[in-house]
Design a protein with these regions (language model features):
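Bacterial Sec-dependent N-terminal signal peptides
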Residues: 1-20
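Sec-dependent signal peptide cleavage junction
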Residues: 16-32, 40-43
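Catalytic nucleophile-elbow at a beta strand-turn-alpha helix junction centered on a G-D-S/GDSL motif
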Residues: 44-59, 77
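Structural recognition of the beta-strand scaffold that forms the well-ordered cores
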Residues: 46-49, 70-73, 97-102, 137-142, ...
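Oxyanion-hole/transition-state-stabilizing segment in secreted/luminal serine hydrolases
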Residues: 54-63, 68-70, 81-119, 139, ...
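Generic structural signal for well-ordered alpha-helices
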Residues: 86, 122-127, 160, 164
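Charged helix-capping and loop-helix junction motifs
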Residues: 115-123, 155-160
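Catalytic His-Asp segment of secreted/periplasmic serine-dependent ester chemistry enzymes
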Residues: 144-218
Length: 218
């Protein structure tokens, strides 16, 4: 009886710790896998990878009705998470273009983080993409300057500048700057483009993004 009880305890602990050690965003990735099982991902689509600015763009297809889009953004993700789950985020798909929006949360997660580290993280993910898709178009959308994260703007601006310089040198790559279109006539970030949390965008914000993104869409 003691042996049975001991075995039960060991099994219980094993199950408990196996659940506890699942990495952050594991469930999001499982949800993507389920979606891909329910419907085979279309080939030659535009694949969106990144954080909540994509996640909350649930009706993105209606903004680009002539494009086939696969949205694999997951809220709260950092570039480190894109790197950790790169195989899951890239292997199931055969896109003609990948567009990335990520980096804000890296700074939000660690306010002392240097811009160079975020640029390094981005280059790592870019390299992972190129290992699988050497010739497709890859674009990076600049980090927006969310009012709720104003103290992080200096690092974000530096990272944007360095990623832009990197992408300019790469073939079949582009840096999509959405920061200017989100400013008013005086160069200030328009708060009316954000919902109450001053982090996520209103439909009007996405309309402005669409205007900037369209020339880059394949």
């Amino acid at each position: 009886m003691k042996k049975i009880f001991s075995a039960f305890l060991l099994l219980s602990f094993a199950l408990f710790f196996s659940q506890e050690t699942k990495p952050m965003f594991w469930q999001d990735i499982q949800n993507f896998k389920k979606l891909d099982q329910e419907q085979v991902p279309p080939k030659d689509a535009i694949l969106l990878e990144g954080s909540s600015s994509f996640t909350k763009w649930t009706d993105v297809a209606s903004y680009f009705p002539d494009k086939t889009i696969i949205n694999r953004g997951f809220g709260g993700s950092r570039l480190t998470d894109l790197n950790d789950f790169a195989n899951d985020l890239l292997d199931p798909y055969q896109p003609k273009q990948i567009i990335i929006y990520c980096g804000e949360n890296d700074f939000a997660d660690n306010h002392q983080l240097k811009a160079n580290e975020v640029v390094k993280r981005y280059k790592t993910f870019y390299k992972k993409i190129r290992e699988k898709f050497p010739n497709i178009q890859v674009d990076y959308i600049s980090m927006k300057y969310s009012p709720s994260r104003k103290e992080l703007w200096p690092q974000m601006k530096e990272a944007n500048k360095k990623i832009a310089a990197f992408m300019k040198k790469e073939p079949n790559a582009a840096f999509i700057d959405i920061t200017k279109v989100m400013e008013d006539a005086n160069g200030n970030v328009r708060k009316d483009l954000f919902v109450e949390d001053m982090l996520h965008m209103t439909p009007e914000g996405y309309k402005l993004w669409t205007k900037v993104m369209k020339p880059y869409m394949k």
